[in-house]
């Protein structure tokens, strides 16, 4: 406590007193901010101090301990400060679909993972991930029903924290109303650069879990692969670039592509192609007339769609006639592989996706890349997994069931 003094003490003592009082107020305000428990507005001076402290925390992007040491504060990809227990034992990953695989490889286990999205589970069951983390297939998915968050089921899982897609504001509001700590992981903060997105996901995981980034080598290698591909394309000078169409989500008569400001644009630009849907934004719905007009040279189908290349090539999809499309006539229809996770969004296999797409979009420039050997070497280096021939076949010919949808 600061002792009360008389006015006659003198200027020097008065200044000393004011400094002491300011120090006490500052310390109290910082403790209140870091504990995140000030529910009411304090006086103006204290509020200003708290605001300054929060800004400094956000700038440093580091964890801050609360006064009692049982919790810590992290700044997620929405810019929000989230108070979390230091000891996190029960984690739910909801609307950020690739993150369960990234988390499992970061932790080397699914032991603390108590809930994931059904679509994440569909991918996991048809991936190589269970070979590395067998218990991933036993994680609960019941808290999401018909794509909707069931708060009652979620509360039954007793999560210490929920990881969600930072753009899903409705989900955040439901979690906040239920008093569940929620950390937002972004997909759009880095211009849909898949390597940078992955890199920032594992960085935030490290801050939340208070652990070292175990996946830093993957991001570093991803940047290296990207730079090597750009150098090869630049050295080639003026090259003919194929017109590329990505069927991002094609099911039940609805065709959605990947336009600008989405991952497809990054993949195509990075590997020597031209996105036919570049004038569209996000994942717009398109029709066959538009596809006939574009007449793409190459078509890629993601694992969010149950359709396979042969469905287009054999023209067996009811209501859609693919027979006149150039890519179909020339047999240049490819399914994105599925390794630890679907290869279209950011994930731990991202460096391999860059190489695979480069060999398809510019086969002459990247003829020296043996993708089967690349995958074997990568899995041994980063996951310590020796892939069999059967594993390789599974990765490059993923099941339709991985989409979680029916044809």
Language-model segments: residues:
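Short, Lys/Arg-enriched N-terminal segments with co-localized hydrophobic residues
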Residues: 1-14
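Bacterial N-terminal signal peptides that target proteins for export
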Residues: 12-25
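C-terminal motif of bacterial Sec signal peptides marking the signal peptidase cleavage site
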Residues: 33-36
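Bacterial signal peptide processing site
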Residues: 38-41
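Extracytoplasmic substrate-binding proteins
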Residues: 74, 81, 171-252, 277, ...
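Alpha-helical, coiled-coil/dimerization segments enriched in small aliphatic residues
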Residues: 256-282
């Amino acid at each position: 406590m600061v002792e009360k003094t008389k006015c006659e003490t003198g200027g020097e003592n008065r200044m000393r007193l004011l400094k002491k009082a300011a120090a006490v107020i500052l310390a109290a305000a910082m403790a209140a901010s870091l504990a995140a428990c000030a529910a009411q507005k304090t006086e103006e001076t204290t509020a200003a101090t708290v605001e300054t402290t929060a800004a400094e925390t956000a700038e440093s992007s580091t964890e801050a301990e609360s006064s009692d040491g049982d919790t810590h504060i992290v700044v997620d990809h929405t810019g929000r400060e989230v108070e979390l227990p230091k000891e996190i034992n029960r984690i739910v990953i909801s609307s950020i679909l690739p993150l369960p695989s990234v988390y499992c490889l970061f932790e080397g286990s699914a032991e603390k993972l108590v809930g994931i999205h059904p679509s994440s589970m569909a991918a996991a069951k048809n991936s190589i991930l269970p070979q590395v983390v067998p218990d991933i297939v036993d994680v609960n998915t019941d808290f999401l029903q018909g794509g909707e968050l069931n708060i009652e089921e979620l509360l039954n899982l007793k999560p210490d924290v929920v990881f969600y897609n930072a753009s899903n504001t409705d989900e955040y509001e439901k979690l906040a109303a239920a008093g569940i700590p929620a950390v937002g992981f972004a997909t759009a903060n880095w211009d849909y650069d898949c390597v940078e997105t992955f890199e920032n996901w594992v960085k935030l995981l490290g801050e939340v879990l208070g652990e070292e980034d175990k996946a830093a080598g993957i991001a570093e290698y991803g940047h290296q692969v990207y730079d090597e591909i750009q150098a090869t394309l630049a050295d080639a000078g003026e090259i003919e670039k194929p017109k590329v169409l990505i069927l991002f989500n094609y099911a039940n008569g609805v065709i959605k592509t990947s336009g600008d400001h989405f991952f497809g644009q990054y993949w195509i630009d990075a590997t020597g192609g031209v996105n036919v849907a570049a004038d569209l934004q996000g994942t717009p719905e398109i029709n066959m007339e538009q596809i006939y007009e574009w007449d793409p040279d190459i078509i890629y189908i993601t694992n969010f769609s149950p359709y396979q290349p042969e469905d287009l090539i054999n023209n067996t999809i009811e209501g859609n006639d693919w027979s006149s499309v150039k890519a179909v006539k020339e047999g240049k229809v490819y399914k994105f592989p599925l390794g630890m996770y679907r290869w279209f969004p950011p994930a731990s296999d991202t460096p391999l996706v860059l190489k695979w797409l480069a060999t398809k979009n510019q086969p002459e420039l990247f003829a020296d890349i043996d993708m089967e050997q690349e995958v074997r070497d990568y899995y041994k280096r980063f996951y310590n997994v020796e892939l069999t021939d059967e594993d390789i076949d599974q990765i490059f010919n993923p099941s339709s069931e991985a989409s979680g949808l029916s044809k």
